[in-house]
């Protein structure tokens, strides 16, 4: 009966090693009858064999327990690592969500930048067109400036000519004064012509005074024009209107001066043609 109990324990141990499958001794099993038929020596041999197997099984069980402990420790480590990985995964998910959000914002900013770039391209094209227009206007302005400079040179030449004419008028004035002095000397002889000479002398004096007034006015306008010309070289934009106005004024003055000069010349020629200015004593016998 004891051998049967030992065998049952051994079978249970084997059952546990084989995965925990339940092994029961059936009531109809003939092992009990077989053990009863064995002799004492056979039972002892069988028991020794069972003890040896039991020792081997205990060693195997101890090894399995050690492996189980190792596996349990590894499992604990894996659990800890799993927790760490779970936390890392959670952080990665959060980082990924933040990255996706940042990516969306970046894409949105990229679209905005693209729109801004397109707008800037349009503005650049418009600026280039405006630049081309400005260049063309600058070229036209340079051409106009060159024309104005040429006009200034022409005006300077005209002013020089006018000054020369003024000098000639002064010379003529001196000649007329000399002639008037001669006429005064001839007053004693030319009593009949004295009244006419005085009238024409008075007219000539009035004309000379008007001419002097016009000359003085012309000098002032000429000085103002010179000053304006020096200023207008730096301020081209204001030059057009002022230069045109000055040109008109100068032209009118020159025309009036030329008209007055022509009138004086005609008067002088008429005076000489209508009066005999020959001095009888100076002329001598004919």
UniProtKB/Swiss-Prot annotation:
Chain intervals for the UniProt region annotation (Helical): 61-235
Keywords for the protein's UniProt record, in alphabetical order: Coiled coil, Glycoprotein, Signal
Gene3D superfamilies associated with the record: 1.10.287.1490
Biological process annotations from GO: double-strand break repair via homologous recombination
Chain positions carrying an annotated carbohydrate: 156
Residue pairs linked by disulfide bridges in the UniProt entry: none
Gene Ontology cellular-component annotations: nucleus; Smc5-Smc6 complex
Signal peptide coordinates: 1-19
Stretches that traverse the bilayer: none
Any one GO molecular function term: single-stranded DNA binding
Stored PANTHER family: STRUCTURAL MAINTENANCE OF CHROMOSOMES PROTEIN 5
Note: The DNA puff II/9 proteins have a proposed intermolecular coiled coil structure with possibly intermolecular disulfide bridges formed by numerous cysteine residues in position D of the heptad repeat.
Name this protein carries in UniProt: Puff II/9-2 protein
Organism, scientific name: Bradysia coprophila
